[in-house]
Amino acid sequence: MKKFGLIGHPIAHSLSPALFKAAYDGKYAYDLIEGEDFETSYRRFIEEYDAINVTAPFKEAAFAKADILSEECASTGATNLLVKTPEGIKAYNSDFLGVRMWLSEVTEDLKGVLPPWPQGSRANSKQPGGLLQRAAPTEWAGSLSDHQSLLKGVKILIVGLGGAGKAAAAAAESLGMDVIRMNRTVRDSQTHPLDDFRKCFRKANIIIYNIPAAIPELKDLTDSDFNEDKPKLILEANYKDPSLREMMKSFGSKAVYTGGEIWLLYQAMTGYEILTGEKPDLTKMSDVL
């Protein structure tokens, strides 16, 4: 029987085991491989598991272990999914795939396009909140660059450039978006410091917030930082203790907020099919959330 799990720290709060159980009705084992040391956790994967999900703070270290990189993984420099294959350990990035799926749901210009798998088929009916009712194929048709002109000129602000932030930036770039990067630690001229948050927020049509706590600069936002004619689309990665959810409600129709549980669901739905080779039950997965 195949065996799967999650490595990272801390992960006791993770919804992944419940999501995985719902996805396949308890057919497969899925363990939390808790530990602060990456090498110890990775060794357990090699010795005991067929494939694993990877979460913070191990995404970059896991990327370095891979023998084979999927296209989306190569574009991010991080992985959240390692699979044993006859050719070696293959790395994927379903954070990337989940963001592309979210963008396809919330961005009007993407209607009729099927990222992250252009050859798949979209379910006609949706659950409340726009959740797709079924998983799509995980095989790529063509290159990630096939849709690079689709959202040219759309500005997206990525706040926080850890593993999830890198994936979000790469996914946005693959659709031709103008990506504004921001991080606590600024390592290059293409990355803005947090002090620039309000200025960059004003410019952006879409904001993906990946920092696990509220930054002081959030308090400076006012109605004047939003567009009059079109709401800003906001995705927050942290679903356990969100910083923006209540704040964005105060701006009414000027902001459309999406919680991290949707990103979690979309990356899980794409990732679990890669792990197992079987389509997950999205309806049961969404019930967990």
Task: Set out the residue ranges of the language-model regions.
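Active-site capping/gating segments
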Residues: 101, 105, 256-288
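Rossmann-like NAD(P)-binding element
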Residues: 197-220
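Intrinsic disorder/low-complexity segments
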Residues: 108-152
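Phosphate/diphosphate ligand-binding glycine-rich loop within oxidoreductases
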Residues: 2-107, 246-247, 256
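ADP-ribose/adenylate-binding Rossmann-like module
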Residues: 81, 226-264
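NAD(P)-binding Rossmann-fold cofactor-contacting core
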Residues: 174-193
